[in-house]
């Protein structure tokens, strides 16, 4: 990639850049990282930094932009957040000692999925995902390079892959198989991530268990290869690969988690107002991340849930000890990410001090846990390794006032190394020795204004003015002559100066070497530190759940095998927290073993959606091991939650509200089991009234007859309430209202039976619509109700079957016609649920041509 008339330094830049064409190359030159050519032009615009040029007077000056080395991280963060890659080229030798061009090499490539530096201590996991396909199944592997966590699973279809990527909130995905450009574009737009291809797998890694499926191994190997290619060093903090099965956790799509505000408020994108916000009383960054993981993946086995419940109960029963435990955890730093900084060779003295400070607290934390005297805590207590030898090393080696950088000195504590102590003594006492020499020579020479000065060129010297030159002693030797004075030295002064300079240089070099050795020793403890981090994070989350349970008067839920739901005076935990206990109206929820569907009717704003979400959050809280917002609760264990709550177009995919509704309904009824929970709110409203009602009825019947999942179905189609006479496992409930003197009060209380009215006009009145408009609406409503009284809107199950048979007979009349046969074949090949509106129009046009 040589260019004519470029300097050797620029040729070096071009040679390196050709290996990293898709990354911004930050090229270290002295105290700056420079960018050139197109990188400089783009970076100047993105980072809002000055754009200049190299060789300004040349015919084709080279665009150039730069950032100071000490603030480079903030600029890297901006580029990474925008989805770019950044390659860091460092100087590999001292420029003062270099012969010719300073040797430079890329030491790291930072990408959205491998970024580890963050100014936020509470920042969530940053997962890099790799996906492979063997023609039958997909292998998916993911890693957080900042913590070393490493996982893999296999999935049956690409829809599951996309869902898992969304749930992980991955910023970068590696594909190990070919994907069309159209599919790539859709994936990038839908998931808002950086997509790369990685076809080379790292084989025979000790981190990978070869008992995994071949496609999992391939995905994990390709992920590891990419990490090694970008980080360009051995990473000792990477943990052994853990296989997981999505069926081991309560399955929820990203849309479901979003609609339930599990990790963030869907309307604001903030933590406040989410279940995570409610449950977070953690004291450590590790605990915060683990709590997010628990909320994201609730359990499905009672043994693991009960184990968590027992520990929460132990903490609840001992307020003083739990408070002491919480206070002690406040001083625990992020061991996981400190370990990764050690592994990356980036840990500074402050990092080691934080690690040492944490280790100093661990014995006391362990003692507190032992003081609970509970067998349920034995497992956790045994996992807490106090690492006394590492704590002693850091405490005895690192000065408590050490700076954040490793080149400022004053890192190593006095008394740790004899040579270093000697050099420091020379530097400390050398100043006094020089003062003594100055006093002695002033008295001996009789030169009253004789003094010793220092500069980099001449070192230490005696300053003698011209008027006193005749009094200069014989053992003085001239070092420099100035206009009005001369500079002299002596053998004694030179000796002391030599000792001080040697001490300064040797001290700096020795202190750096000692710190590197200590950091290398710390690295040997990374495995034990990571195990300690997991144990402390678990303790932190469990104490957090205990604190939340006590503050909010939650109860311990029970689990039953009778497939019944019995929640007495339950509350929507998040809404209650926002409104306050006094304002919130609780609701009991009951599903008997023979009840599978609650059909919920009632006006808008009355609380139907809150009631449905209340059940979902209660289930999720129970299955992460938390206590729940109710007076009592008995639940079955659910394997999945499916929701359709709220309406919105998917503009990126070109899908309308109704199409999204139907796709989510299809996803639910095809994947749900009798152990699942389905929440459908106003399904069918995105199309014409009778179309919507017909679909709603058919979906309810399908769930009732074929799926058997516990289902809440909220609707404004009051005609559907008649289904309770035909479907034995369906019950009607409604949101109670109080109507008096023309005024309507929503009681936000669930009652048995169907609602008698929708009160839509009353809601419109609350919204402030003009009274004359509302009066006209009342007139129209009365007329429409009169017209529909004689008409039965819900077909019986028998009528549905007869109608279907008639449709089949009518269709068979045309089977001998060639064009009809072609139309049927074309229709059978169409994947209706995955059509965009534009694609649907194209299909209709093709069918029309066949007529």
From Swiss-Prot:
Q: What SMART domains does the database record attribute to this sequence?
A: MUTSac (SM00534), MUTSd (SM00533)
Cross-referenced SUPFAM superfamilies:
DNA repair protein MutS, domain I (SSF55271), DNA repair protein MutS, domain II (SSF53150), DNA repair protein MutS, domain III (SSF48334), P-loop containing nucleoside triphosphate hydrolases (SSF52540)
* PROSITE patterns hit by this protein: DNA_MISMATCH_REPAIR_2
Q: GO cellular-component terms in the record?
A: cytosol
- Gene Ontology terms, MF aspect: ATP binding; ATP-dependent DNA damage sensor activity; damaged DNA binding; mismatched DNA binding
Which amino acids does the record list as binding ATP? 602-609
Key words, A-Z: ATP-binding, DNA damage, DNA repair, DNA-binding, Nucleotide-binding
Q: Report the InterPro entries cross-referenced here.
A: DNA_mismatch_repair_MutS, DNA_mismatch_repair_MutS-lik_N, DNA_mismatch_repair_MutS/MSH, DNA_mismatch_repair_MutS_C, DNA_mismatch_repair_MutS_clamp, DNA_mismatch_repair_MutS_core, DNA_mismatch_repair_MutS_N, DNA_mismatch_repair_MutS_sf
Name the job this protein performs.
Answer: This protein is involved in the repair of mismatches in DNA. It is possible that it carries out the mismatch recognition step. This protein has a weak ATPase activity.
Q: What's the protein name?
A: DNA mismatch repair protein MutS
Give the species this sequence originates from.
Answer: Streptococcus equi subsp. equi (strain 4047)
